[in-house]
Amino acid sequence: MIIWLSNFLEQYFPFFRLFEYLSFRAILSIITALTISLWMGPKLIAWLQNLQIGQVVRDDGPESHFSKRGTPTMGGIMILTAITVTVFLWADLTNPYVWAVMFVLLGYGAVGFVDDYRKVVRKNTDGLIARWKYFWQSSIALVVAFALYAYGKDTAATQLVVPFFKEVMPQLGLAYILLTYFVIVGTSNAVNLTDGLDGLAIMPTVFVAAGFAFIAWATGNVQFANYLHIPHIPLASELVVVCAAIVGAGFGFLWFNTYPAQVFMGDVGSLALGGALGTIAVLVRQEFLLVIMGGVFVVETLSVILQVGSYKLRGQRIFRMAPIHHHYELKGWPEPRVIVRFWIISMLLVLIALATLKVR
């Protein structure tokens, strides 16, 4: 929104030309989202406490988690508010890619809100019935997938980028819709599964968003896109502002979510952030890099799949408890140790993924 105003004012006040620079708006995006989160946090936490909207803890979970009962949840409202306000302030709202990410972010946020609300009101861990959650996740993802395919059909926006091979970028055709669907839904649920310890999900989300900010900038810059042998998609550059908003909001939320947490993001936050990251990965054509950058999310999800599969097929569990962060807790690792080590792994994976852009 500000960029529209600056286009008008710059003819009278040259200073406003600064707002045309993507880097300047990205910095302002981080600062704005961070400020909103820090300002909103205490108010939201107090409001949630007054409404007795507290975390419901599974009886079969680690004993160390029983003390978390009653801690305010649905803190993702803070994250989504900060991102939404920031994007509407600093992003170019004529860019359809911005709207695609925001549609998924807010749509999945609404699904997560209903899920959290039902958990809190009914005081159990069931929440929204699984088939309805999956239905709404699928519906939102398919709407975006079909819209993006119709908009970018047979262009660089629908090519498959294969790591390590600079000339291998086949057109996906209708398979683009299927890939987009699985990436968005899968990433959303993966982040949701990871959100089980204080600050565990938010920092990997921040790292991945920061990585995608660089990729979005490179993808939108014709010189760098050619240099790195990745598709040049001009619209992708504006996603830098969106990624910056996620980074700023994430740091602001971490201020209150760090161990011991004052608030949890809940499904309203984790489903939305995961869906947004998946959408960004699709838009910049780096689905494979998402698997590397989001390796923590991938491993958490695989641990659940392997645990369930092993128990049903062999009657035996592979891990003491899934997702895998609970396995390490039950092995005796203090919660902060699990969290920080997962953060370190996540940061390294993002750096490795970025390095692969040059290894072609």
UniProtKB/Swiss-Prot annotation:
According to its UniProt record, which reaction does this protein catalyse? Answer: UDP-N-acetyl-alpha-D-muramoyl-L-alanyl-gamma-D-glutamyl-meso-2,6-diaminopimeloyl-D-alanyl-D-alanine + di-trans,octa-cis-undecaprenyl phosphate = di-trans,octa-cis-undecaprenyl diphospho-N-acetyl-alpha-D-muramoyl-L-alanyl-D-glutamyl-meso-2,6-diaminopimeloyl-D-alanyl-D-alanine + UMP
Subcellular location per the Swiss-Prot or TrEMBL entry: Cell inner membrane
Q: Domain of life here? A: Bacteria
Q: Has keyword Transport?
A: no
BP-aspect Gene Ontology terms = cell division; cell wall organization; peptidoglycan biosynthetic process; regulation of cell shape
User: Is the ATP-binding keyword given for this protein?
Assistant: no
Named in its record, the pathway it takes part in is: Cell wall biogenesis; peptidoglycan biosynthesis
Topology in the lipid bilayer is annotated as: Multi-pass membrane protein
Q: Where are the transmembrane segments?
A: 27-47, 73-93, 94-114, 132-152, 168-188, 199-219, 236-256, 263-283, 288-308, 338-358
Which cofactors, if any, are listed as required? Answer: Mg(2+)
Where is this protein primarily located? Answer: membrane
Q: Which UniProt keywords apply?
A: Cell cycle, Cell division, Cell inner membrane, Cell membrane, Cell shape, Cell wall biogenesis/degradation, Magnesium, Membrane, Metal-binding, Peptidoglycan synthesis, Transferase, Transmembrane, Transmembrane helix
GO CC terms of this entry: plasma membrane
| Xref: Pfam families | Glycos_transf_4, MraY_sig1
Q: GO: which molecular function terms? A: metal ion binding; phospho-N-acetylmuramoyl-pentapeptide-transferase activity; UDP-N-acetylmuramoyl-L-alanyl-D-glutamyl-meso-2,6-diaminopimelyl-D-alanyl-D-alanine:undecaprenyl-phosphate transferase activity
| This enzyme's EC code(s) | 2.7.8.13
Function description: Catalyzes the initial step of the lipid cycle reactions in the biosynthesis of the cell wall peptidoglycan: transfers peptidoglycan precursor phospho-MurNAc-pentapeptide from UDP-MurNAc-pentapeptide onto the lipid carrier undecaprenyl phosphate, yielding undecaprenyl-pyrophosphoryl-MurNAc-pentapeptide, known as lipid I.
- Which family does the UniProt entry place this protein in? Belongs to the glycosyltransferase 4 family. MraY subfamily.
- Protein name according to UniProt: Phospho-N-acetylmuramoyl-pentapeptide-transferase
In which organism is this protein found? Aliivibrio fischeri (strain ATCC 700601 / ES114)
Give the gene symbol. Answer: mraY
